[in-house]
Amino acid sequence: MSYQSMEEAKLRGEKENIPFWKAIQLEDAQERDVKIEDSWEKMKYMWQSMLDALDAYEPDKVSRSGLVGTEGGLMDNYRENEEPLCGDFVSKVMSNALKMGCNNAGMKRIVAAPTAGSCGIIPAVFIAYEQYYKVNEDSIIKALFTASGIGEIV
């Protein structure tokens, strides 16, 4: 994306009277030379890939090295049987992040969002948010555009 600063993206939004996420989507479509609808569908596909990656988690499978794999299941058990200090929502995010990390280490579908080093933090947060707060998919897609724009600028 060609935005060099948050201010630049914000100014486009103000100039065209559109929200921040839409400015990012328009820039994405322009940069990739696709229709706005195609940009939306691509982000929707990425969201579904994140959901699929989390669904693919198997708590009894370990990585080839044997070092990781069960942590997401352990966190789920803790959440169900204890009262996590960080509360239900944050512990759900932690569980999702551990599952994504285990799947990445086990060479399942790799979701490197925002980067491979963060190992699926965006999916972990957004999936927990969708489940916990019962928001619609369009809201998540808009949030993904927002996050991708911020990530690109930073």
Predicted regions and their residues:
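A structural-propensity feature for long, helix-poor, extended segments
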Residues: 145-154
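Alpha-helical support elements that line or immediately flank enzyme active sites
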Residues: 123-135
